């Protein structure tokens, strides 16, 4: 099971929170489609800014969009011009005021999405894919991850038949739910077609604090009593 399912979705509520933080009984469908449109727009607008994730919080009168990025300068623009332009577009799209919060990713060399985007960009620039994969592998291990796996598939080096190659270092315990596993995906568009890049990173286990475990025990007792 752990080998097939998306490791992020499998661990929501265990090692990772939700990317959409809101509740609605009547407008659930409308809000869900709006969230998808917002994410697609931001990903296309800032495709070269290393956008890791977009967290959307909804309130009755406004929407908060928290944008986690490795390159905040590109997102902000000169004197905040990009932010103001994006806020206007999102306000038109959602018909509500939108607050755009930029959160910088501290160590992009250890984040799966940033690694996948870096590999895809270098493949588009005609860099040797094996060298690129090995470089990113070493950089991530030096950055502090405990395991990393990189998989690319497509017409590698312009070959007539598509194939896949992967490199792995450390361990990726996909069946361990408390393991902090991140997944990144990006497509490199080349003259021979698209090459898919997938990256898995493992950065240790989620250890619950003593206070949280005591609260959980109390909640279980209260429900069963």
Swiss-Prot record:
Keywords, sorted A to Z: Ribonucleoprotein, Ribosomal protein, RNA-binding, rRNA-binding
Any matching Pfam family: KH_2
KH type-2 domain residues: 38-106
GO BP term (any one): translation
One GO term describing the cellular component: cytosolic small ribosomal subunit
SMART domains in alphabetical order: KH
UniProt-recorded Gene Ontology molecular function terms: mRNA binding; rRNA binding; structural constituent of ribosome
Family of this protein: Belongs to the universal ribosomal protein uS3 family.
Subunit comment: Part of the 30S ribosomal subunit. Forms a tight complex with proteins S10 and S14.
PANTHER family for the chain: 30S/40S RIBOSOMAL PROTEIN S3, SMALL RIBOSOMAL SUBUNIT PROTEIN US3C
Function: Binds the lower part of the 30S subunit head. Binds mRNA in the 70S ribosome, positioning it for translation.
Protein name as catalogued: Small ribosomal subunit protein uS3
């Amino acid at each position: 099971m752990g080998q097939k399912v998306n490791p992020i979705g499998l661990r929501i509520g265990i090692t990772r929170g939700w990317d959409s933080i809101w509740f609605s009984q009547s407008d659930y469908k409308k809000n869900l489609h709006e969230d998808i449109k917002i994410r697609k727009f931001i990903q296309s607008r800032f495709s070269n800014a290393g956008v890791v994730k977009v967290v959307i919080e909804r309130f009755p009168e406004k929407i908060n969009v928290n944008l986690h990025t490795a390159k905040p300068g590109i997102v902000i623009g000169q004197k905040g011009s990009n932010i103001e332009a994006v806020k206007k577009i999102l306000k038109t799209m959602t018909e509500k005021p939108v607050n755009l919060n930029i959160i910088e990713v501290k160590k992009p060399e250890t984040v799966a999405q940033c690694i996948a985007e870096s590999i895809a960009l270098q493949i588009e620039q005609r860099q040797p894919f094996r060298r690129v994969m090995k470089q990113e592998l070493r950089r991530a291990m030096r950055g502090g991850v405990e395991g990393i796996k990189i998989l690319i598939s497509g017409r590698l080096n312009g070959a007539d038949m598509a194939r896949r190659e992967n490199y792995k270092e450390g361990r990726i315990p996909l069946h361990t739910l408390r393991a902090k596993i991140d997944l990144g995906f990006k497509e490199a568009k080349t003259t021979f077609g698209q090459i898919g890049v997938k990256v898995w990173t493992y950065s240790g286990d989620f250890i619950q604090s003593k206070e949280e475990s005591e609260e959980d025990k109390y909640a279980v007792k209260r429900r069963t009593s």
